[in-house]
């Protein structure tokens, strides 16, 4: 696994995002990709940027649909990631909660989430900071 971290890769990451047409998806509408998986054309994020033009607005029908679908598919969970799969042109939602089926504990990190859902070593790691201030 190749792991790249720190600000020296930030410019490169933004360029690659444009080239791959990967856009931000996730917990917050203003989030930017923190992990990029070229093989699957997926971007996962935990920090803010303007790369969110395809993220469903909180007032949109798409957002409401996904939120309701998540509640039905994952009852009892409150936090989730939204991921847009470019090749299939579809949104999917996955839970992050204390009862997470992907990891025992108080939730799931972005890195663990990707490992469990995608099961691939082809991860380009862009940022070392997460919402808890520690390293992933």
Question: Residue spans of the language-model regions?
Answer:
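Conserved catalytic cores of phosphodiester-cleaving nucleases, focusing on short active-site segments
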Residues: 17, 35-37, 41-52
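Short, charged, amphipathic alpha-helix that recurs within catalytic cores of restriction-modification
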Residues: 54-82
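Acidic-residue sensor for enzyme active/binding pockets
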Residues: 10, 45, 62
